[in-house]
Structures are given as structure tokens and as C-alpha cells.
Amino acid sequence: MTKTLPKDFIFGGATAAYQAEGATHTDGKGPVAWDKYLEDNYWYTAEPASDFYNRYPVDLKLSEEFGVNGIRISIAWSRIFPTGKGDVNPKGVEYYHNLFAECHKRHVEPFVTLHHFDTPEALHSDGDFLNRENIEHFVNYAEFCFKEFSEVNYWTTFNEIGPIGDGQYLVGKFPPGIQYDLAKVFQSHHNMMVSHARAVKLFKDGGYSGEIGVVHALPTKYPFDANNPDDVRAAELEDIIHNKFILDATYLGKYSDKTMEGVNHILEVNGGELDLREEDFVALDAAKDLNDFLGINYYMSDWMQAFDGETEIIHNGKGEKGSSKYQIKGVGRRKAPVDVPKTDWDWIIFPQGLYDQIMRVKADYPNYKKIYITENGLGYKDEFVDNTVYDDGRIDYVKKHLEVISDAISDGANVKGYFMWSLMDVFSWSNGYEKLYGLFYVDFETQERYPKKSAYWYKKVAETQVIE
């Protein structure tokens, strides 16, 4: 049976400042930790990325032509405040005014994120969000943006609080590159959630027009053997690390007893303790019913198996299928069923996981109000032939995920839009320019854009709301 989506559904494309803009030191932009980190540790940098800083009119014209009526954009904090605080950079402010004006001219609604992995270097080297002073700096930055950019109708505080902490302190593939420090992961998540809550409360108290929410990456976690209580426990603990801890903070304004039992177990086994203060919970509680929407980024699910051994994580950065490894002491290890498809980067393709995650939010956090799927897409080694990419695998991936969104809506979930990652090809944080996701192919040498087969397919779905 052919499935459909509502008439007012947003068919969007997603970007992020650092992954798309290039121009990393142009017009007064301050440095971010990624600048030197990529130079020192990877085979690529954020120059030129997709040169969105100069070519956004081209990308927004393409968006309009291909039925994309929403775009996720992030503001680079260090374009506004080069050191994260203090003096404002007027050229950075002007750039985003021009960008948002172009969005509205092209009838592409901007959904604007304040922080997408790119804390200014001056604050990052001072502890980033492990340093509580950063909460104040973020709230001040947020307030400036709310006042300055009144043309923005949809605000997101953070993109993917979970993967920020994981990347920085667990997997160690984001600066500062620390591995296996679970206490830092949870503390970073907590402090960012307090920052989020304070910014949301400020937005509502300030009477600013528009809506505000947060974007969480929510990979669904399943037990490898649902009949084995140890596997069930492993999945629950892994879910706490990646999903439940931040969802509780967002919508309960506290951590449930079950969540804290899991956190305490993980820290008992791995060492470290948390600094959770009374005023933090006052802030979380004050914001728990003020979120206008939840953004869910969903790419994959994981299966967890009980495991008794030391932590070891191997990140598959170059698309060498089967080279990744993930096992955490006192938690479990990832072990997927053999019949579940994976990408070359070992990301598990499982659309049902998106349905299950949406329905979990609906059941466990009934004050969620509404959901946007703010990222979903297929990373692929695209082949450019005949001035296009015949990306049938991407079409199949997106189609199956749109179908389960349609199912979730039919089953009572309030899902209002979908943003494909990514609008045009961008560079990937820890995979470089080989892992591509865009609707529009980017020749990174000439910066020419070419619509892929998926762009024509997406246009038809956006125009008809029929998934076929």
C-alpha cells in the first residue's frame, strides 16, 4: 500500500556551519578546536567544504527548484563572537542576516541551530562544556542571537548533545580526543542540557517570537537476544548513555531513578563521579514543558550483547566495512544480527528503529509536543557519472524511513517534518570528503552543484506527499 505524509509536512535538507561554509578564517571568524585538530589528526580540513559561505544563493535556488521547503542551518558561534564572548563581529552578524533573507526569498524555512559541534577554540581549550563557565557564555550568545535574528522562526539550542560528549570523551574522534572517560561524557551531556534549559527559559521569558527546541541523536538500542536478561540489561545501559539521560533531562527536568541507577553502575565500574547541583535541576525543571519541538536525528540502530571485559572502541573512518569495534566495560558490546544490512562505515540500516524511537518518545515523554526528523540519510561513496549520481541505494533508504514516519503519524505521533542529511554534499567530521550524503553532488574542486537522482525523486515526494 502506498503511504502518504500530511499536506503541511516540511520536506527539508540539513546543513551545519563548519561542515558546509568553508571560509574558516574569513571576515573575522574566530578559530574553533576543529581547525587544528583536523590538521593534526586527519587527511582533510574544513576548507573549502561546500563553500556555503559564498554559494548559499545557489544552494537555496536549487532547494526551491527541488521542492525543499525547509533547511537546517547552524550559526557558527565564532563568527558572531570570535572568542565565544566579548566583542561582536559585525561581519558575521551581517552574513547570517543575508543568509536568512535569502532563505525567505526562496521560500525555504530556516531551522537555525546555535551550536553544532563548533565551540570557539578559546572556550574549548578552557574545558568546553565540562567548564561550568561555558554555560553562561552559551546563554549570553543565545540571548544575543534571539534579539538580533528576529527573522528566525525556529530555533534549536544544540545539535546532538549525545554525540558531542561521545566524540570528545568516549570514542575520542572529536577534539580534545579523550577516550573511554564515561564520567566526562555524562558531565558534558548534563552541562549542555543545563545550557539548553537556561536558553529555552530565557527565550520564553523574553517573549521572543517563534519556536525553540533541541536536536537529539537517538539511535535505537536492542538486546541481541531479547530472552537473555544480560543482553536486555546491556541494551538498557547503552540506551542510558546515548538516549535516556538526555531525554530525561529534556522532558522530565531530572533523571529518573532507573536512569541514575544505570549511570551510577557505569561510573562504579569505570570510575569517576558527577557534579550535579541543585540549581541545575531547578533550571532543567523550569524548561521541561517549554520545548516547542524535539528534533530527532536517526541514522541507525544497534544490538547489544552482554560482555565481560575491558573497553575498546575502534572507529571505522574510511569505509572499510567490518573494521569497527565497540565494547564498554560494565555495559556491553555491539553485535548485530547477520541479516541486518550495514553501510561501508558499519552503520546499521534499520528503518524500524526510527519508528520504535518515535513511539518511545511519545510513550515515555508525553509532553514532547511535536517531532521533526532533523537528520536522516545514507552516507555513500557516490560515483559521479553523466553529470549526476545514480543513487538508488539512497532513494531506497530515505523511502523506507519516510514510510515508517507515515506509520508513526498514523499511530498517533505528531511528526511535522523531515530533513534529509544533507542538502548538498558536505564533509563528514571524522570521515572526510569520501562519505557523501547530499541531494546535490558537489565537485569540491570547482564547487559546481549537480542534482543526484535522489533529488528528482525527493522533489516528486515533496510535491505529492506520496511516498513511492
Swiss-Prot record:
Residues that hold D-galactose 6-phosphate according to the record: 19, 116, 159-160, 297, 428-429, 435, 437
Pathway assigned to this chain's UniProt record: Carbohydrate metabolism; lactose degradation; D-galactose 6-phosphate and beta-D-glucose from lactose 6-phosphate: step 1/1
One of the record's GO cellular component terms: cytosol
Name of the molecule in the record: 6-phospho-beta-galactosidase
GO function term, MF aspect, one: 6-phospho-beta-galactosidase activity
UniProt keyword terms in alphabetical order: Glycosidase, Hydrolase
GO biological process, one term: lactose catabolic process via tagatose-6-phosphate
Keyword Nucleotidyltransferase annotated: no
UniProt family annotation: Belongs to the glycosyl hydrolase 1 family.
Active site (catalytic residues): 160 (proton donor), 375 (nucleophile)
Alphabetical list of HAMAP family matching this protein: LacG
Leader peptide range in chain numbering: none
InterPro entries: 6P-beta-galactosidase, Glyco_hydro_1, Glyco_hydro_1_AS, Glyco_hydro_1_N_CS, Glycoside_hydrolase_SF
Enzyme Commission numbers on file: 3.2.1.85
Catalytic activity, reaction form: a 6-phospho-beta-D-galactoside + H2O = D-galactose 6-phosphate + an alcohol
